[in-house]
Amino acid sequence: MALVEGNNGVSGGAVSFSEEQEALVLKSWAIMKKDSANIGLRFFLKIFEVAPSASQMFSFLRNSDVPLEKNPKLKTHAMSVFVMLRKAGKVTVRDTTLKRLGATHFKYGVGDAHFEVTRFALLETIKEAVPVDMWSPAMKSAWSEAYNQLVAAIKQEMKPAE
């Protein structure tokens, strides 16, 4: 299954992960999508718990007196980020989205350490969101691989906006 689609994708073509990995991501997503807004918010709260200074990378959080968990702009942003891999029932991200993500992450100085914190927060959030008997090393690996591929694609596009 292609994770990145479009004319150029990653390294000149689509990057894929196994059907088993895709099935695990889709199975867990089917459980989480009913509460994706709250799960997305918990994901960002986990990021800020691990790396409090990360909140300053978001213009809508700087100088805000609204508690993070009640910030409507964070809730909206969290929802959009959390469902990104699940557009149109596929585990894909379009080239145009990657270009925008790359430019945005470049603009705000996102680096490897930020991506690592985000990976940790994502995996912990999913682990807490799915039933205990569903979470497994294979599911963790599947989500980690999907995330790794997304990050690799974003990094290829990390340059100033044109």
UniProtKB/Swiss-Prot annotation:
Gene3D superfamilies: Globins. Mainly expressed in germinating seeds, seedlings, roots, flowers and leaves. Residues 16-159 form the Globin domain. Induction: Accumulates upon salt (NaCL), drought, cold and asbcisic acid (ABA) treatment and in response to osmotic stress (mannitol). Induced in nutrient deficient conditions (e.g. K(+) and Ca(2+) deprivation), but down-regulated in resupply conditions. Its main location: cytoplasm. The keyword Coiled coil does not apply. GO terms for cellular component: cytoplasm; nucleus. A motif (Homodimerization) lies at residues 49-53, 112-124. It comes from the Eukaryota. Signal peptide: none annotated. Its EC number is 1.7.2.-. Pfam families: Globin. It is found in: Cytoplasm; Nucleus. InterPro entries: Globin (IPR000971), Globin-like_sf (IPR009050), Globin/Proto (IPR012292), Leghaemoglobin-like (IPR001032), Leghaemoglobin_Fe_BS (IPR019824). Keywords: Cytoplasm, Heme, Iron, Metal-binding, Nucleus, Oxidoreductase, Oxygen transport, Stress response, Transport. Its cofactor is heme b. The record marks K140 as: Homodimerization. Binds 1 heme group per subunit. Heme b binds at S59, K73, H77, R100, T104, H105. It catalyses: Fe(III)-heme b-[protein] + nitric oxide + H2O = Fe(II)-heme b-[protein] + nitrite + 2 H(+). GO terms for biological process: cellular response to calcium ion starvation; cellular response to potassium ion starvation; response to abscisic acid; response to cold; response to nitrate; response to nitric oxide; response to nitrite; response to osmotic stress. Belongs to the plant globin family. PANTHER family: LEGHEMOGLOBIN-RELATED, NON-SYMBIOTIC HEMOGLOBIN 3. Phytoglobin that reduces nitrite to nitric oxide under anoxic conditions (e.g. during flooding or in waterlogged soil). May not function as an oxygen storage or transport protein. Has an unusually high affinity for O(2) through an hexacoordinate heme iron because of a very low dissociation constant. Promotes tolerance to low potassium K(+) conditions. Homodimer. This is Anaerobic nitrite reductase NSHB2. It comes from Oryza sativa subsp. indica (Rice).
